[in-house]
Design a protein with these regions (language model features):
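Flexible, solvent-exposed loop/hinge segments and secondary-structure transition points
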Residues: 1-162
Length: 162
């Protein structure tokens, strides 16, 4: 989860230090957060961590999407459970794929995020699919968009400053 949020995850930190950062900075989900975890700094909401899950091509996929307090900008995505084809669909969990989501803007017209074929021209809400993993990419796009739409619906009209 920390990898999806800004400024919390560093590879060289011990598990104890990572756990400390999590417990000191992250509030557990509740109705006011639309069931997302909340990252607070100096009492203000900095970002949300939205757990998402759904059926991949071969097995369930579970991930966390980090979203800035503006509810419009993605801070990152971390795929923590998947059993897709090694070297193909399993690439969704690698940084080469997930880093594409950083600073993408959630679209409010149509799909919040679009995963497009490799080589396609990308807009502000688009990332490239994993080459050779069309089914996994399509299913992950559906999981992400279902999770974002449900969360945005829950958060509609809520005050960010709490």
């Amino acid at each position: 989860m920390l990898a999806a949020l800004p400024g919390l995850y560093e590879e060289n930190l011990s598990r104890l230090e990572l756990h400390k950062r999590f417990t000191e900075s992250i509030n557990t989900p509740d109705d006011s957060s639309g069931d997302a975890y909340i990252l607070r700094q100096n009492g203000k909401i900095v970002a949300y961590a939205l757990p998402i899950s759904g059926q991949g091509f071969w097995a369930p996929i579970k991930a966390v999407i980090g979203i800035k307090a503006d509810k419009k900008t993605i801070t990152g995505i971390a795929v923590y459970q998947q059993n897709e084809t090694p070297g193909l669909g399993a690439e969704i969990a690698r940084a080469a794929f997930t880093e594409q989501f950083r600073d993408k803007v959630i679209s409010f017209d149509g799909q919040p995020i679009n995963i497009k074929r490799p080589g396609a021209v990308l807009g502000g809400s688009d990332v490239h699919a994993v080459t050779g993993a069309t089914q996994t990419s399509t299913r992950l796009e559906n999981i992400i968009n279902t999770g974002l739409k449900e969360w945005l619906s829950k958060m509609s009209g809520r005050d960010n400053r709490k």
